[in-house]
C-alpha cells in the first residue's frame, strides 16, 4: 500500500479530493482548588492547574480563568471556537458564583451593584442574591454575563467589602455539580 502524510499529500477518488478527517477536540471540566493559578508558566511558588492534569492534557487551554484565590468550575479544551463562544462578551454566557463577604451586604450596596459600579475598566453590574445558610453567613449568589479580571472582587471592594470566598458553580451550560468529587472530568 501507499503511505500518506497528512497535511502534505492529497487523496482523490474519481477527481474528488478527500478531506482530512476532522480533528477530535478534547473537553475537560475541572474543579479548580484555591491556591492554583490558571497559567502554563510557574508564577513564583504557586502551583498551576496544569500540575493537576496528566501529561497528555497539558496542551489544553483554559476558557474563562479564575484567579489564584478563587475556586470552582473551569473548562479546558483544544477547541478554539468553543473558547471564543464561551468567553467573548458578545455571546453573554451566564456565569454563577457563590461569594462570601466579610460582612453582610446592605440593600443599598446590592442595588448599586445591580445598577452598576464604575471601575477603572468600565461599569460592573451583576445580580446579587443572599444564600440562606446559618453555617456560612454572608454568602451570596452572583450571576453575571461578562467576566473581566477580578471583576467581582473589585466591585465589592469599591463599596467597602472584602471577598472571603469565591467559587464559580456554573459557566455557560456546565455546572460544578457535574464533577462531584473529581478534580477533572472528560465531557
Task: Please provide the spans of the model-predicted regions.
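Basic, flexible Lys/Arg- and Gly-enriched helix-loop patches that mediate nucleic-acid binding at interfaces
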Residues: 1-187
Amino acid at each position: 500500500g501507499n503511505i500518506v502524510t497528512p497535511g502534505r499529500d492529497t487523496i482523490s477518488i474519481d477527481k474528488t479530493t478527500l478531506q482530512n478527517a476532522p480533528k477530535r477536540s478534547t473537553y475537560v471540566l475541572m474543579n479548580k482548588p484555591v491556591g492554583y493559578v490558571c497559567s502554563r508558566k510557574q508564577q513564583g511558588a504557586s502551583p498551576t492547574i496544569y500540575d493537576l492534569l496528566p501529561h497528555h492534557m497539558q496542551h489544553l487551554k483554559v476558557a474563562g480563568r479564575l484567579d489564584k484565590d478563587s475556586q470552582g468550575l473551569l473548562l479546558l479544551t483544544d477547541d478554539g471556537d468553543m473558547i471564543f463562544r464561551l468567553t467573548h462578551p458578545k455571546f453573554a454566557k451566564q456565569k454563577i458564583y457563590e461569594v462570601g463577604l466579610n460582612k453582610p451586604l446592605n440593600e443599598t450596596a446590592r442595588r448599586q451593584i445591580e445598577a452598576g459600579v464604575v471601575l477603572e475598566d468600565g461599569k460592573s453590574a451583576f445580580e446579587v442574591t443572599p444564600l440562606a445558610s446559618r453555617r456560612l453567613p454572608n454568602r451570596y449568589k452572583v450571576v453575571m454575563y461578562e467576566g473581566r479580571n477580578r471583576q467581582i472582587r473589585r466591585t465589592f471592594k469599591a463599596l467597602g467589602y472584602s471577598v472571603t470566598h469565591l467559587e464559580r458553580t456554573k459557566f455557560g451550560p456546565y455546572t460544578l455539580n457535574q464533577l462531584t468529587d473529581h478534580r477533572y472530568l472528560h465531557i
